[in-house]
Amino acid sequence: MAASRNSPPNSLPDRVAAFIAARTTPNERLCVGLSGGCDSVVLLHVLAACGLGDRLQALHVHHGLSANADCWAEFCAEYCRRLGVGFLTEHVTVDRNSALGLEAAARAARYEVFARRAGDLLLLGHHRGDQAETLLFNLLRGAGVAGTAAIPAERRQQRLRILRPLLDVAREEIEAYARDHRLDWVDDESNCDTGLTRNFLRHQVLTVLAGRFPAAERNLAQAAGHFSEADALLGELACLDWQAAVDGDALKLAALRELSLPRLKNLLRYRLRQLGWHAPAAARLDEFSRQLQTAGADRHPALDLAEGSMVAGRGVLRWVGRG
């Protein structure tokens, strides 16, 4: 795999080519999530410049939230036609009154389409600015280590692998690439709405921080990388604790009571992630963990969650799904 012959050393195509070569095999198909915005337009162009055109396919999700949504889908289709890249599109209906909030509901709908239509390997255009925003957003929500790890460069969502080749790239470099190659893209008008949390962080909070700390974005993204390493270590520790306590699909209560409280909570979060269950609020998990450590044989602590329950009894802790 090689970048364009006209690319300078350590150019964006060179770095993306190296990223892809290190994580994929030559016969794997690459599906790019194409919104029509600058980031995904540049990502698709760079991948084509790397000589990967015959492996590429683009997938556009039509959310129907903007009066311009049809125009964006048409733009993406025409852009892919010019690049000689296969193009797929799918319409979704987003609940504007979702308890998740509009941003999160749209994201959930988008990723559901990705899971069904992207094949085995999906490439997304998140960049360093997105990483900094996500870290700030999660910190302000009181996230733990997993949340502050922010956006991973690679992760698996069931059978789907998700790669983000531009995650270490600054927004300014992406926009400069687009200008240098005379690329057009669409501007989502909602990106200027500071009533949306991420836009507020991008346009107001990070802008102010950058005025005082010019390296704020880079350093926040670097911190997210450190948190990611810490999260991986906690995962390894939880795996060891799981192996020491496992009894079929359950965990021995006697082994759990030998763990410190932070270590026990780490193990419970690890298991919930394995199952794809949402973790409870920190205070609820803390209280349940204390009950597991102190309850007598005649007590059966339980914690109800959206997907099921964690229930202690007969010397073990079990996870019981609903239905």
Segment roles from a protein language model:
Residues 2-39, 55-59, 63, 92-96, ...:
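AMP-forming adenylation/ATP pyrophosphatase catalytic core
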Residues 2-207:
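Core alpha/beta nucleotide-donor-binding catalytic domains of modification enzymes
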Residues 141, 145, 210-214, 232, ...:
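Alpha-helix boundary/capping and short turn/kink residues
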Residues 175-225, 229-232, 300, 312-315, ...:
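Mid-to-C-terminal catalytic subdomains of enzymes
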